Every structure is written in C-alpha cells, then in structure tokens.
C-alpha cells in the first residue's frame, strides 16, 4: 500500500511524485482505471464551454429538483443557489478531497458568508484546472438570471465529469443541516396561520373576563342578552369564514398568475439568450446588423433614454418653420 504522500497511478502502481497544494497537503481525487477499478490520482477535470440552450436544457423547476435530489437539499428557487454551498458539495462529489466541506457554511444567510463559500469553490476549480470564471459578485446578489445561467452550465459540467459512483451527501457534510438561504418573496404566500378561535370575539371576551371570587355569586345575564350575544358571535364567525375563503381564493389566483408570469419570463429570456449566443458567434464578422442587435441587448435604461433625446431634438428641429430672410 502507498504511503500518505503517495498516490496510485491508473495501472495501480505506486507514484512517488509528491504534489503539494498551498497548504502543503496531498488532495487526490477519484477516477476510473481501464479495468474499472477505483483509484486516486491527480488529473484535470473535463471542461465544458458550450452554454447554448438546447432541448436538453432543464427548466428552473426541474433543475432545482435535480439539485435537491443529488445533494439532499430543500431549495425551492434557483435564487437560493446564491449561497454557493450546493456547488461546493457537488465538487466534493465529483472530485473527492478537492474541497473541505468542514469549511463550507451550509447555513449561510448573509452575503459575506456566500462569498466565503464561492472562494472555496474557486479554489477547488483552480485545483482541478476548471476553465470557468465564477461571477461571484452577480451570483451572491441572488438574481434569477445570473444563478440560472451558472447552474445550467454546472449541470453540463456535472454530466461530463460524474463517474457514477454512489455518494452520501449528508454523511459527507457530517450531518450539517443545509438550510436554504432566506427568500423574501417566499414570505408573501406563507403567512402564519392564526387559529380561528383566537380571532373570535368569544375568545377575547373569555380572556378579558375577570376570575370570579370564591363565595361571590356571579350575576347571570338575561336570556335576551344571551341570545343577542350568541347571535352576533355566530354572525361574526360566518363573516370571518367568508373572508378567509375569499382571501384563500385571492392567494390561489395570485400564485397561478405568478407562475404564468415566471414561465413567460423564462420563455422570452431563453429567446434572448439564443439571440445573444448567435450574435457572439458572428460578432467577428463586423456585421452592422449583429452590432445593432448587441447594442439593443446590452443597452441599459439610462443609455436608452440618452439615445432618445437627440432623436426628439432632431424631430423638433424639423417641425420648426423656416425663418424668412430679411432684405
């Protein structure tokens, strides 16, 4: 058996070449030999450069379900990948030992904690010679488009490098609770439910009524007052139930509307992404049409406002009547 500073070559022989990282330790990763046996050795990851949208590209719902299934997480939105914890565990799964999961903040809730995780991910990319620039500043902001682009690329990178071995993500992170990052939008439709009894007038009356003294005879209300109070209470209960039903219907309709808007947004974003990739492929031809399309895709609101001002001034100048010459 090789020593702690030795590795196994693909043919099973000892490799005495010591390769050290910045900390002076050997970090091997797993790969297959020709015989199908498991061995540990240094090597390069399979890089993926294609980012074009194809039929194999997964939707945002499917890709989140894939992430949760592979690394046993409970994410609900693409934006929650901004913590970087899932990517760190993916790298440990693909290349065991290239990253220390003990240093990963699986319960990260703040931006500086997200940056910490992405620094670990960058270091693992460097060790495995992954030619991919991680847009950390964009990802940690939790924007949908930036995180969707990166996870789509990472899915292809995963498919190109996964060797099919079994992996227990919970055991690998030593039972750390992987709490998804907070999502402000999630609180809109998940308001805490209050018990109907706590909101009823009868409950408030029961809490506010003083305790009867021992030996004193409490005065009993008349039958007419009891009937009127019970009637008003039942009426208010029915009104509250009606309001609850109406609010639930509104929440359901808003959820459906939101899902429709998100699907439409994803559809048009995919179209724009395809146009952008075509423009990038033909950008070296110095085509005026391609350049105009690129200007439209990357134009900001401020830039668009500035471009409209000269046109408005030119139209106003054309509408002015010509001045008569003086003799």
From Swiss-Prot:
Pfam families: CH (PF00307), EB1 (PF03271). GO terms for cellular component: cytoplasm; cytoplasmic microtubule; focal adhesion; microtubule cytoskeleton; microtubule organizing center; microtubule plus-end; spindle midzone. It is found in: Cytoplasm, Cytoskeleton. It comes from the Eukaryota. GO terms for biological process: cell division; positive regulation of ARF protein signal transduction; positive regulation of focal adhesion disassembly; positive regulation of keratinocyte migration; protein localization to microtubule; regulation of microtubule polymerization or depolymerization; spindle assembly. Residues 236-306 form the EB1 C-terminal domain. The keyword Cell cycle applies. Residues 187-327 are annotated as: DCTN1-binding. Residues 200-234, 318-327 have a biased composition (Low complexity). Phosphorylated at Ser-236 by CK2 leading to enhanced cell adhesion. Phosphorylated by CDK1 and AURKB during mitosis reduces the binding affinity of MAPRE2 for microtubules. Ubiquitinated in an ASB14-dependent manner; leading to proteasomal degradation. Changing residue 236 to A: Significant loss of phosphorylation and cell adhesion activity. Residues 259-302 are annotated as: APC-binding. Residues 1-21, 171-240, 299-327 are annotated as: Disordered. Keywords: Acetylation, Cell cycle, Cell division, Cytoplasm, Cytoskeleton, Microtubule, Mitosis, Phosphoprotein, Ubl conjugation. The modification Phosphotyrosine is found at residue 167. Interacts with DCTN1. Interacts with APC (via C-terminal). Interacts with monomeric and polymerized tubulin. Interacts with SLAIN1. Interacts (via the N-terminal region) with BAG1. Interacts with ASB14. Interacts with HAX1; this interaction is essential for epidermal cell migration. Belongs to the MAPRE family. Composed of two functionally independent domains. The N-terminal domain forms a hydrophobic cleft involved in microtubule binding and the C-terminal is involved in the formation of mutually exclusive complexes with APC and DCTN1. PANTHER family: MICROTUBULE-ASSOCIATED PROTEIN RP/EB FAMILY MEMBER (PTHR10623). Adapter protein that is involved in microtubule polymerization, and spindle function by stabilizing microtubules and anchoring them at centrosomes. Therefore, ensures mitotic progression and genome stability. Acts as a central regulator of microtubule reorganization in apico-basal epithelial differentiation. Plays a role during oocyte meiosis by regulating microtubule dynamics. Participates in neurite growth by interacting with plexin B3/PLXNB3 and microtubule reorganization during apico-basal epithelial differentiation. It is linked to Skin creases, congenital symmetric circumferential, 2: An autosomal dominant disease characterized by multiple, symmetric, circumferential rings of folded skin, affecting primarily the limbs. Affected individuals also exhibit intellectual disability, cleft palate, and dysmorphic features. This is Microtubule-associated protein RP/EB family member 2. It comes from Homo sapiens (Human). The gene is MAPRE2.
């Amino acid at each position: 058996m090789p020593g702690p500073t030795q590795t196994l070559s693909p043919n099973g022989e000892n490799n005495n070449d010591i390769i050290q990282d910045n900390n002076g330790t050997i970090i091997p990763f797993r790969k297959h030999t020709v015989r199908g046996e498991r061995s540990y050795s240094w090597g390069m990851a399979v890089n993926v450069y294609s980012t074009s949208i194809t039929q194999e590209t997964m939707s945002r719902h499917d890709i989140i379900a894939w992430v949760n299934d592979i690394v046993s997480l409970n994410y609900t939105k693409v934006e929650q990948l901004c913590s970087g914890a899932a990517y760190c565990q993916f790298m440990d799964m693909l290349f065991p030992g290239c990253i220390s999961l003990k240093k990963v903040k699986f319960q990260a809730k703040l931006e500086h904690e997200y940056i910490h995780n992405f620094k670990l991910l960058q270091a693992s990319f460097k060790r495995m010679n992954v030619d991919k620039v991680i847009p950390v500043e964009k990802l940690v902001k939790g924007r949908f488009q930036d995180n969707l682009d990166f996870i789509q690329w990472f899915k292809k990178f995963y498919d190109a490098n996964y060797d099919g071995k079994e992996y227990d993500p919970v055991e690998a992170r030593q039972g750390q609770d992987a709490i998804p990052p907070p999502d402000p939008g999630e609180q809109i439709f998940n308001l805490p439910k209050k018990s109907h009894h706590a909101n009823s007038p009868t409950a408030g009356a029961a809490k506010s009524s003083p305790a009867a003294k021992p030996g004193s005879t409490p005065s009993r209300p008349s039958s007419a007052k009891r009937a009127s109070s019970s009637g008003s209470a039942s009426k208010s209960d029915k009104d509250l139930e009606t309001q609850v039903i109406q609010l639930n219907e509104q929440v359901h309709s808003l959820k459906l509307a939101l899902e429709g808007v998100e699907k439409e947004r994803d559809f048009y974003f995919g179209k724009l992404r395809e146009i952008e990739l075509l423009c990038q492929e033909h950008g070296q031809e110095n085509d005026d049409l391609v350049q105009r399309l690129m200007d439209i895709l990357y134009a900001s609101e401020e830039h668009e406002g500035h471009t409209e001002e000269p046109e408005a001034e030119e139209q106003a100048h054309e509408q002015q009547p010509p001045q008569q010459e003086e003799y």
